[in-house]
Amino acid sequence: MTTAHRPTFDPARGKEALRGPAYHQRLLPAYTHLKVRQSGQGTEGEAARRDLRAELLQAEAAHFAKKNGAPVPEASAESTPKRQLEGAPANGGDGELEEDPEAKRRRILEETREIDADSEASEEDSSEDESDDEDEAAELMRELEKIKKERLAQKEKEERERAAKEEEQREVDIARGNPLLNPSDFNIKRRWDDDVVFKNQARGTEDKRGKEFVNDLLRSDFHKKFMSKYVR
């Protein structure tokens, strides 16, 4: 991040200039106290008191229950093993807080048995769903093949019809383009400029009538012929 927009706190001075007692804020000591973890922030003692295996089994049971649509079992205080409190004697009056190893083993076996049963049921359901999905996919593929064949047949039919129409039109064009079959095409057509005023002025000058003022288009021969042909 640039600091070009900040004002100069300590401008340059000569060697003989005396410096005052002011210090920049960045030159002051900072972070003089070390932060430590407080209670509830995952200290070593809290990590030692956690039973990670029980938490994992409980999370797996909740997951399979949610997947199978069964009610999620609530976490009970009895299901979580109680560890020895810090500062308590190892063999004292509070020894009953620790769970019996045999009871703990039986509880873990029961939980794992339930989880295995749930997983087997979910596997059976998933296998049935997979078989149904395969049947539906096969049916869809058959329908798709049928639609493709119908479209291909329709396209071939349209191609044949178009080819037949093109062949028929070609034969008609050939027949009409034959001058022997169309004698009317031998008629000589007049040019569009046959009756204009200034066409072939040098031809037939000896047969010209008297001098006429042709620049007046309203009284020219072309205008008269045009009016008599298309207006009258």
Curated annotation (Swiss-Prot):
Composition bias type Acidic residues, residue spans: 117-138
Subcellular location: Nucleus
GO molecular function, one term: RNA binding
Main location per the UniProt record: nucleus
Gene Ontology biological process: mRNA cis splicing, via spliceosome; mRNA splicing, via spliceosome
Compositional bias segments (type: Basic and acidic residues): 139-174
Subunit structure: Associated with the spliceosome.
Annotated family: Belongs to the CWC15 family.
Its job: Involved in pre-mRNA splicing.
Protein name, UniProt field: Pre-mRNA-splicing factor cwc15
Source organism of the structure: Emericella nidulans (strain FGSC A4 / ATCC 38163 / CBS 112.46 / NRRL 194 / M139) (Aspergillus nidulans)
Lineage of origin: Eukaryota, Fungi, Dikarya, Ascomycota, Pezizomycotina
Gene name linked to the record: cwc15
